[in-house]
């Protein structure tokens, strides 16, 4: 995390509670020029998925070259494999449009199905790779693009790479394989012995190994062919047959797969003992997953997602993904998640594998979780004058990163430079909006936002209630005005809700913003702490933001009534240690502006003397970044 982040969001929003004194209907396309030139693309696209078993009706994959013109148009030339055409690769070409915002958020018209859109992000230069997924339609997919230059030679591939893969053999969800291996290339067409670790759904989903010797690679026409031995029965081995691979211009990334198959392979240049501290800042992510829930009855659970994570340089990260489950609409998930500890990391379900430079990582599922996630480091930004960091419009409670949408009534923190001439906090309610605070105003889709705190590097504000889907707005554009000087504009997605639980800094400040114990009170208004834990059967008060519209409505920045309670319009669920809690109240905290409160009963049977996840779920959001002392 960049050093300008500070733990003031909770103190300025909850001051006193704990004794602490125009429509934006089009995505920002201002950075289209950042996506320009020749890219190698691998995409696996699954459609016609059965809503009960997740059986795949049609599988398609493409591999080849996509050329972006820097002005919002692309062409693709390569090969497509389609189960509707016998699963034999055929020449394929397509064209379409794309947009890239100032923060790297991208939307690309699908080259496989022009009615679908790939959502994702463009990474930092060196290389500016793209990761994306079509989460808003009925299909599930993963899209990876890396910049490629002149024709690759055998000498271009030298050194050690992690490679991760996911393979829907014959386009069948019940025959999915995944795994990872290390490649050591000599620059002359030879690999050292390879050990593949992975699992096969059709072989019992038990983690297994495959040893390969004498594997070679050859370069021709810009493509590197990895000559894995072809097994007589490919369904019984993790890896089989030749793979067509591309290498990025900086030689650090690989992407490809089988032209006649439905696999995706991503490789990252690596080394032993990669420092955890290298993993800082924002990473754009995309993934495709199939969880085997009952193979004997044909049940699979396929989902795809795009998102981002904010790596804290301490081995942990705040993670958001826009996840499209089979049989349901996409929703937004935020969690805190451990990433790396000096190299690869296994959390019991996923194996995470880092690149040597911190520019990328891959994550592979194990056993019955068949998954491939790719993370690409986003660009770091700086500016002069009044400047919003394009990656730093964050939920003020969870610090969920830039792909997380904003919701009406949500407390948001904006980070940057020159945002204010001095530090100021609102002293009364309603919070100032058009009148400004310390000479500062903030516009959200042209509306003045109520301000609770301003400083040269951070502003805390309330998103006006008319913002988002309730106002037929898919995007929200933020702009700061400091003493009549306007900042750059930054555009993000919106949703009905974007829950974020406020957390407390404790243990001498060891918890970074967005991670730690939840801000929860007992009935006597004392804090829930390790020495004063929650108990089964008691009613607790949880404080959060991003729960959206309320009834009766409250004016922007005004205090919620202390006599007529404003309850949230969305259905809310609270999960404590895996058990659903009964909710007595969910709405605005009486007497406060923009602060939401949930009163819930701690379920019986929770583990004592520990910490458990406290999860808040809405119809379109899922927040699991905070924990509860029990």
Predicted regions and their residues:
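Bacterial N-terminal signal peptides that target proteins for export
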Residues: 1-12
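A sequence-level detector for low-complexity, Ser/Thr- and acidic-rich stretches
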Residues: 47-54, 170-174, 178, 286, ...
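Mature soluble binding/inhibitory domains
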Residues: 23-387
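N-terminal start and proteolytic maturation junction detector
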Residues: 11-14, 360
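C-terminal segment of classical bacterial N-terminal signal peptides
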Residues: 15-24
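Short linear Ser/Thr-Pro motifs
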Residues: 6, 123-124, 248, 355, ...
């Amino acid at each position: 995390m960049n050093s300008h982040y500070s733990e003031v969001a909770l103190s300025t929003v909850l001051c006193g509670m704990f004794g602490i004194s125009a429509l934006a209907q089009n995505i920002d396309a201002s950075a289209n020029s950042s996506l320009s030139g020749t890219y190698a693309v691998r995409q696996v696209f699954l459609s016609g998925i059965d809503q009960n078993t997740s059986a795949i009706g049609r599988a398609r994959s493409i591999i080849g070259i996509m050329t972006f013109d820097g002005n919002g148009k692309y062409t693709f030339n390569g090969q497509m494999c389609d189960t509707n055409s016998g699963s034999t690769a055929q020449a394929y070409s397509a064209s379409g449009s794309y947009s890239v915002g100032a923060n790297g958020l991208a939307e690309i018209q699908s080259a496989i199905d022009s009615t679908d859109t790939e959502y994702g992000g463009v990474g930092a230069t060196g290389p500016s790779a793209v990761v994306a997924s079509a989460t808003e339609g009925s299909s599930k997919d993963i899209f990876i693009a890396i910049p490629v230059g002149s024709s690759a030679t055998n000498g271009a591939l030298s050194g050690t790479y992690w490679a991760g893969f996911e393979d829907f053999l014959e386009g069948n969800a019940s025959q999915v394989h995944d795994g990872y291996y290390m490649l050591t290339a000599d620059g002359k067409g030879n690999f050292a012995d390879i050990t593949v670790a992975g699992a096969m759904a059709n072989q019992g989903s038990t983690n297994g190994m495959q040893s390969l010797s004498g594997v070679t690679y050859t370069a021709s026409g810009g493509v590197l062919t990895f000559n894995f031995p072809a097994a007589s029965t490919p369904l019984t081995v993790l890896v089989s047959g030749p793979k067509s691979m591309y290498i990025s211009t900086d030689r650090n990334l690989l992407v490809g797969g089988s032209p006649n198959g439905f696999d995706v392979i991503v490789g990252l240049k690596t080394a032993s003992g990669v420092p955890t501290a290298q993993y800082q800042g924002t990473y754009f992510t995309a993934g495709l997953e199939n969880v085997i829930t009952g193979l004997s009855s044909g049940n699979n659970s396929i989902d795809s997602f795009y998102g981002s994570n904010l790596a804290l340089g301490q081995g942990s990260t705040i993670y958001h993904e826009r996840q499209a489950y089979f049989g349901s609409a996409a929703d937004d998930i935020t969690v805190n998640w451990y990433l790396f500890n000096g190299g690869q990391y296994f959390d019991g379900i996923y194996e995470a594998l880092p690149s040597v430079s911190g520019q990328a990582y891959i994550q592979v599922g194990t056993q019955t979780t068949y998954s491939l996630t790719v993370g690409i480091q986003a660009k770091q930004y700086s500016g002069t004058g009044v400047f919003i960091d394009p990656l730093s419009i964050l939920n003020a409670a969870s610090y969920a990163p830039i792909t997380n949408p904003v919701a009406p009534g949500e407390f948001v923190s904006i980070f940057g430079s020159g945002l204010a001439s001095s530090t100021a906090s609102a002293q009364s309610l309603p919070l100032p909006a058009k009148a400004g605070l310390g000479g500062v105003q903030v516009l959200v889709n042209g509306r003045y936002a109520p301000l609770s705190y301003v400083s040269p590097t951070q502003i805390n504000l309330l998103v006006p209630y008319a913002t988002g889907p309730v106002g037929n707005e898919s995007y929200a554009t933020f702009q700061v005005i400091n003493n009549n000087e306007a900042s750059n504009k930054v555009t993000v997605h919106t949703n009905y809700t974007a829950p974020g639980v406020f957390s407390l800094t404790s243990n001498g400040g060891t918890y970074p913003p967005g991670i730690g114990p939840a801000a929860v009170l007992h009935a006597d208004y004392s804090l829930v702490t390790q020495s004063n834990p929650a108990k089964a059967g008691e009613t607790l008060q949880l404080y959060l933001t991003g729960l959206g519209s309320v009834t009766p409505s409250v004016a922007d920045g005004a205090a919620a009534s202390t006599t007529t309670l404003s309850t949230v319009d969305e259905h809310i669920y609270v999960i404590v240690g895996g058990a659903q809690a009964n909710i007595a109240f969910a709405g605005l905290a009486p007497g406060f502006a923009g602060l939401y409160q949930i009163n819930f009963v701690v379920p019986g049977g929770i583990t004592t003397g520990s910490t458990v996840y406290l999860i808040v779920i809405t119809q379109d959001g899922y927040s699991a970044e905070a924990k509860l002392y029990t």
